[in-house]
Design a protein with these regions (language model features):
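Membrane-proximal helix-turn-helix segments that form the acceptor-binding/catalytic region
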Residues: 23, 82-89, 104, 108-112, ...
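Acidic donor-binding loop of glycosyltransferase active sites
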Residues: 156, 265, 279-296, 309
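Carbohydrate-associated surface elements
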Residues: 164, 184
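Nucleotide-activated donor-binding/catalytic signature segment of Leloir-type glycosyltransferases, i.e.
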Residues: 251-275
Length: 390
């Protein structure tokens, strides 16, 4: 099939949804399909057989876009829609595959051309408004909830990335249109170079202390206040290494740590190349996911589980819909409980849990399984549309 994919993100940048889009395209390519990707004017080109990238025009004064909703994103989406319209009238497509708020553009494409529409629902658009502290306006939140409902009702097929989104979508549209595809793929090879891992640990300057590591964005919903409060409950034999965050976020956090007397126990590395993350994970003694808001599974969880390093995560639906106590230490989102979870993971129990997690990933999170699920979602899109494709 010839597929038009709408991605209102900077493709490719090493963060949540672009990672997911990348692996969707990889799977579609392996299945023999051709993809025309319409995306933002930022990001790295990726070479995948059958992929063509069409970037929207860059609005004056906008040179980047942060994670989550923003005023800049609204402007970029308007320019993206113009690019989508251009492709709609210049290309022949068998399917339109939309991501996130691009779903409403997919609905327009579907209505005007009778092309089957596959909606890739990575999150609740309405919930994002609160998670990213973008707005508390009931009117704005209601607007995005309406967009979400229109997209769900009109799509011939819907991909959801976690059980919470599945339940939410099933309350709006037919459950037989839904396909649950967790974002478990990661094509970065595991780090087996022990010398490199040792040098990384030495570069942290933490000496013989137990290294607790978080790798990911520093957005409000990720739970940094909980993690910092938990570090205060642990003795000085523990150090925290934070990988990720913008320069501004890192500077703000550095000031907070200095004010609380923790600057000497926390290493702030900022963003690191995506290809290097497996080595950083292996350099840790304990990995943490202190997320406190939202219901989506953090994409980073899958690489954490596959790292061979014990994981501590908050005992909230964002984690528990996928993670069991058999493969991670689950702790209440309270400083004392989370600190106790870190201490437990640093001991003998942590090694056993990490081994079970690694085995679980090897058995369940395979490229073959992922490709089967993508093929199933495509089949539903074709079967559920009045226009049949070939």
């Amino acid at each position: 099939m010839n597929i038009l994919m709408i991605a209102p993100e900077p493709f490719f940048e090493p963060r949540g949804t672009p990672f997911s889009e990348y692996f969707r395209i990889r799977a579609l390519s392996a299945l023999g399909h051709r993809v025309d990707l319409v995306t933002y004017p930022f990001g790295e080109d990726r070479q995948i057989p059958g992929l063509r990238i069409f970037r929207s025009w860059r609005p004056p004064g906008i040179r980047a876009v942060k994670t989550g909703p923003s005023g800049a994103k609204l402007v970029l989406d308007a320019f993206l829609f113009l690019r989508v319209l251009g492709r709609m009238f210049s290309g022949q497509y068998d399917l339109v595959h939309s991501h996130e708020e691009g779903s409403i553009m997919g609905v327009v494409f579907q209505k005007l051309t009778r092309t089957p529409h596959l909606y890739d629902m990575h999150s609740s658009l309405a919930q994002q408004m609160g998670n990213f502290q973008f707005t508390r306006s009931r009117l704005v939140i209601r607007f995005f909830r309406i967009i979400e409902r229109i997209s769900l009702k009109n799509a011939a097929s819907v991909i959801v990335i976690c059980r919470a989104l599945y339940d939410q979508a099933a309350a709006v549209t037919a459950a037989d249109k839904l396909t649950l595809i967790e974002n478990f793929l990661d094509d970065r090879p595991a780090c087996t170079d022990e010398g490199r891992v040792r040098r990384l640990r030495e570069s942290f300057g933490t000496g013989a202390r137990t290294i607790v590591m978080y790798a990911g964005t520093l957005e409000p919903y990720q739970g940094m206040p909980l993690l910092i409060d938990s570090m205060e409950r642990l003795d000085a034999s523990y150090s925290l290494v934070l990988v990720g965050g913008t320069a501004e976020q890192v500077a703000d956090l550095r000031r907070v740590l200095a004010a609380r007397g923790l600057a000497g126990r926390v290493v702030l590395l900022g963003r690191q190349p995506a290809a290097d993350i497996p080595a950083y994970l292996r350099a840790a003694d304990v990995l943490v996911s202190p997320r406190t808001l939202g219901t989506n599974i953090p994409l980073k969880i899958y690489s954490f589980l596959a790292s061979g390093v014990p994981l501590v995560a908050t005992d909230l639906p964002t984690h528990t819909q996928t993670i069991s106590p058999d493969i991670a230490v689950l702790a209440r989102p309270e400083p004392e409980a989370f600190a106790a979870g870190i201490a437990r993971a640093a001991g003998a129990a942590g090694k056993e849990i990490a081994a079970r997690a690694l085995d679980f990933c090897r058995r369940n999170y395979t490229p073959e399984r992922y490709q089967e699920l993508v093929a199933a979602a495509l089949a539903k899109a074709v079967a559920g549309s009045p226009r049949r494709t070939g």
